[in-house]
Amino acid sequence: MHSRISKADKGSIKISGKEITELKYDELNNIRVRIGFMFQNGALYDSMSVRQNLKFTLKHHTRDLSDEEIENEIIEALESVGLKESIDKMPAELSGGMQKRIALARALIIKPEIILYDEPTSGLDTITSREISELILDVQKKYKTSSIIITHDMACAKITGNRILILKEGEIIAEGTYAELEKSKDEWVRSFFI
């Protein structure tokens, strides 16, 4: 929604003070290139190696890099998620946690200002979920990115969230820090924190 892949039913979405629901195509594309995505299932191309997945993304967003510059960007992105040694592996050879890390490297390779995470810890064990949550924090600090994290994993929300919004039927019903929401007067909101 934040990159206006789909149309908003109601409300407004502002990025850097610009109402994106009203932007023309070219203006919207200028916003989109500033946003990285980490999809719930990783969304890696099965027929491409890790290197090829990252190269495809980089070439799609940046047309003026030499092959050497592209390779350096790929290595830097993989090093930032601790998976440089997986550069020539196929997605099927990677664990779920490794696929999530590669998906994050793919989001990072375009040097976004904002990263949108869709259920970054979904389908992972508790230890790997915590590692991914901590990696999100590391990425925020190292690359100075803002993060929007969509999650049902309250442990992830506690680790990564400065502000948490709770939605019910598409409406925001609560907003605050983890500690504030944990003590909410609303029993339904508190039920998420048990």
Question: For the regions a protein language model found, what residue spans apply to each?
Answer:
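Conserved ABC ATPase signature
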Residues: M90-L94, M98
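Conserved catalytic motifs of ABC-family nucleotide-binding domains
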Residues: K111
